[in-house]
């Protein structure tokens, strides 16, 4: 909302408020420039005592998980809402690390067709024709998933929001309808399938109100309840010595760099422009300094030397 407020007043988006939580010394809100590293954000929270850990970018349900090594390359983008440092034995890490091949095998061997994944699916409850249990059922009786791509029930996988409620809470067998949906969506896109929205208005199911799930219960299932009731009282300004600003931070075409190495720029200066006749969003410098590196993927700016 704050970013929308800024945009409505023609203020350039160069900094992001995000949470730095999990297994850290001092959970904080960080006001960070775009392109600031995860390591700099972690330092603002006092670091972590863990030798090995994973980093969750976003929330437990739909966030992306990175290993400690992968996290070395993480930077703040326009869509970063927070970083969560997690111990290696966290249940959430296990669930998000299951290979697709195993998910498909479990769909064939372990699904009991209780239909809880459908009964609790937010899409289904708001009137969409998505029925995850039907997709699981049809996968169980086929050798090649690609033979199902013309099936109407399977095509509904395209409207899965990937919220993960089915596999993180609803399924009593601990299998992975969300990941199966994601896999089928990939096959459908590869085939060139485009989902056609219903022409009639969707009708919310009356039982929707009674099938909502407590976020705290989900956090407990995922093993992250220890970080659920944090009371963060500090908001710290991050002033890094260097930022690495990605040229693709959004849906649409990546930006083309409009600066060169050695150039001195001020905060808010344009560093990336959308290609002609392409949808996207401009990228601006988040700190004042000298451009030290330019590639087709990012622009590195070192603090100092502003004009």
Regions found by a protein language model. Name each.
Residues 1-165, 169-173, 178-188, 194:
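Redox cofactor-anchoring modules in respiratory/redox and cofactor-processing assemblies
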Residues 19, 32, 56, 79, ...:
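Generic detector of intrinsically disordered, low-complexity, polar/charged segments
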Residues 146-148, 156-257, 263-266, 270, ...:
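Flanking helices and flexible, charged tails adjoining ferredoxin-like Fe-S electron-transfer domains
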């Amino acid at each position: 909302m704050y970013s929308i407020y800024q945009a409505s007043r023609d203020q350039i988006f160069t900094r992001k408020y995000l949470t730095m939580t999990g297994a850290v010394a001092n959970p904080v809100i960080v006001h960070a420039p775009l392109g600031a590293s995860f390591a700099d954000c972690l330092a603002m929270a006092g670091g972590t005592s863990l030798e090995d850990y994973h980093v969750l970018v976003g929330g437990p349900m739909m966030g992306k998980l990175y290993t400690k090594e992968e996290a070395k390359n993480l930077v703040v983008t326009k869509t970063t809402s927070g970083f969560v440092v997690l111990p290696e034995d966290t249940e959430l890490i296990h669930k998000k690390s299951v290979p697709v091949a195993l998910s498909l095998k479990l769909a064939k061997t372990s699904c009991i067709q209780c239909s809880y994944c459908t009964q609790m699916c937010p899409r289904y409850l708001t009137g969409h024709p998505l029925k995850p249990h039907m997709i699981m059922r049809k996968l169980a009786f086929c050798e090649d998933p690609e033979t199902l791509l013309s099936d109407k029930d399977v095509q509904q996988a395209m409207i899965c929001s990937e919220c993960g409620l089915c596999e993180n809470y609803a399924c009593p067998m601990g299998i992975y309808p969300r990941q199966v949906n994601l896999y089928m969506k990939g096959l459908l896109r590869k085939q060139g399938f485009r989902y056609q929205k219903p022409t009639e208005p969707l009708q919310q199911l009356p039982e929707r109100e009674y099938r909502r799930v407590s976020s705290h219960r989900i956090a407990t299932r995922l093993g992250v309840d220890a970080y659920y009731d944090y009371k963060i009282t500090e908001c710290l300004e991050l002033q890094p010595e260097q930022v690495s600003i990605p040229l693709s931070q959004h849906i649409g075409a990546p930006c083309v760099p409009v600066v060169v190495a050695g150039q001195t720029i001020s905060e808010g200066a344009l560093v990336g422009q959308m290609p002609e006749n392409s949808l996207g969003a401009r990228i601006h410098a988040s700190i004042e300094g000298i451009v030290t590196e330019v590639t087709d993927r990012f622009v590195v700016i070192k603090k100092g030397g502003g004009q």
